[in-house]
Curated annotation (Swiss-Prot):
Reactions performed catalytically: 1-(5-phospho-beta-D-ribosyl)-5'-AMP + H2O = 1-(5-phospho-beta-D-ribosyl)-5-[(5-phospho-beta-D-ribosylamino)methylideneamino]imidazole-4-carboxamide
Top enzyme class: hydrolase
Gene (UniProt): hisI
Protein source organism: Pseudomonas savastanoi pv. phaseolicola (strain 1448A / Race 6) (Pseudomonas syringae pv. phaseolicola (strain 1448A / Race 6))
Name of the molecule in the record: Phosphoribosyl-AMP cyclohydrolase
PANTHER family: HISTIDINE BIOSYNTHESIS BIFUNCTIONAL PROTEIN (PTHR42945), HISTIDINE BIOSYNTHESIS BIFUNCTIONAL PROTEIN HIS7 (PTHR42945:SF1)
Length: 130
């Protein structure tokens, strides 16, 4: 029997894009990367765990901020090369800027306009010692 992780088309770096969506509203919260271990741990721990390309290590969402993403459902797209995580975003903040979503800018009049408010100052989030 084929391992469920073997069905994924990992890129040349062994990663797959992972999109986190709010399980109730469907709003896209963020996009990050997962390697095989991150996806396996996400499924077993029922929380979002990503691969940090900049730090070169696993990143348990919320480990510093307390803004954990509880997993409700995992989905794989038709080409088996993108994952969607349907999550409950603890604290209502997914973005390191203190916003609900990382997608807080809208293209308008040949430029990017910030449309979502900062819900909590990032300095307060990351200095709280979570």
């Amino acid at each position: 029997m084929k391992d469920w992780l073997d069905e994924i088309h990992w890129n040349s770096d062994g990663l797959v894009p992972a999109i986190a969506q709010d399980h109730k509203t469907g709003r896209v919260l963020m996009m990050a990367w997962m390697n095989r271990e991150a996806l396996s741990l996400t499924a077993s721990e029922n929380r979002a765990i990503y691969w940090s390309r900049s730090r070169g290590k696993l990143w348990r969402k919320g480990e510093e901020s307390g803004h954990v993403q509880k997993l409700h459902e995992l989905r794989l797209d038709c080409d088996a090369d993108v994952i969607i995580l349907m999550v409950e975003q603890i604290g209502g903040i997914a973005c390191h800027t203190g916003r609900e979503s990382c997608f807080y800018r809208v293209y308008e009049n040949s430029g990017w306009k910030t449309v979502d408010p900062v819900l909590k100052d990032p300095d307060a989030i990351y200095s709280a010692g979570h």
